[in-house]
Design a protein with these regions (language model features):
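Alpha-helical lid/collar subdomain of P-loop NTPases
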Residues: 115, 124-216
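AAA+ P-loop NTPase catalytic core and its hallmark functional loops
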Residues: 1-143, 150, 176, 204, ...
């Protein structure tokens, strides 16, 4: 069960809400309710996007009580196979600090920075036909951006793995590598000075005269 959190997420989104069906009021079960009832994995995607009071309804679900109390309906115990996983990008715009009571109910895995070996493995997995020189160029650009971001010289907006992979996909269907990098990486920086820095870094890695044949 995938539950995408946002600023409008509330308890009714997670647990359920009243609905009118067959001439009577019934509970329309939310994703958390169904996961608790049937078992399986519940994925709280971007858990730090929601307001803390929305996530507070999960407290009894996530601690030793392992139950959900639905006002006006019944109290249900969690299926033994129910597990919940929360994901978040700490520090992203629009996110907030997590409630301490909520954090204490999770085991936290801190994802390390992407290494060169893992980055190349991901790129090769999605684009096995990529040439070695292009792999070094695109992978090297991402690692350069990662180093700049770690040193607080640029923001993390351009250090976008999805953008890098999308740029390669755009090259595959006909864009020049430079155009693809502009749209997938450079233009993610909305500050003009930061964009110039990222553009200069890209120029050192991706020649403007490259074509699709230089990449695939």
């Amino acid at each position: 069960y995938n539950i995408s959190f946002n600023v409008n997420t509330d308890s009714s989104t997670l647990i359920g809400t009243d609905t009118f069906r067959n001439n009577q009021v019934e509970l329309r079960k939310g994703s958390v309710y169904r996961c608790a009832e049937e078992g399986g994995f519940g994925i709280f995607d971007e858990i730090n996007m929601a307001k803390n009071d929305a996530a507070s309804v999960l407290h009894a679900t996530l601690d030793h009580r392992r139950m959900i109390d639905v006002p006006g309906y019944e109290r249900i115990d969690l299926h033994p196979a129910t597990r919940f996983i929360g994901t978040m990008n700490y520090g992203y715009a629009g996110t907030r600090e997590l409630n301490e009571a909520l954090v204490s109910r999770f085991l936290v895995i801190d994802m390390p920075a992407l290494t060169k070996e893992n980055l190349y493995r991901i790129i090769r997995h999605d684009y096995p036909e990529i040439k070695e020189e292009a792999l070094d160029a695109f992978g090297g650009l991402f690692l350069d951006l990662q180093e700049k971001a770690d040193n607080s010289e640029i923001s993390t907006k351009c250090m976008d793995l999805r953008g890098l992979l999308s740029a390669l996909g755009a090259v595959k269907i006909g864009l020049t590598p430079w155009q693809a990098v502009q749209m997938g990486i450079i233009n993610k920086a909305f500050d003009i000075f930061e964009r110039e820095i990222v553009s200069d870094m890209a120029m050192t890695r991706i020649p403007e005269d490259w074509t699709r044949e230089n990449v695939f």
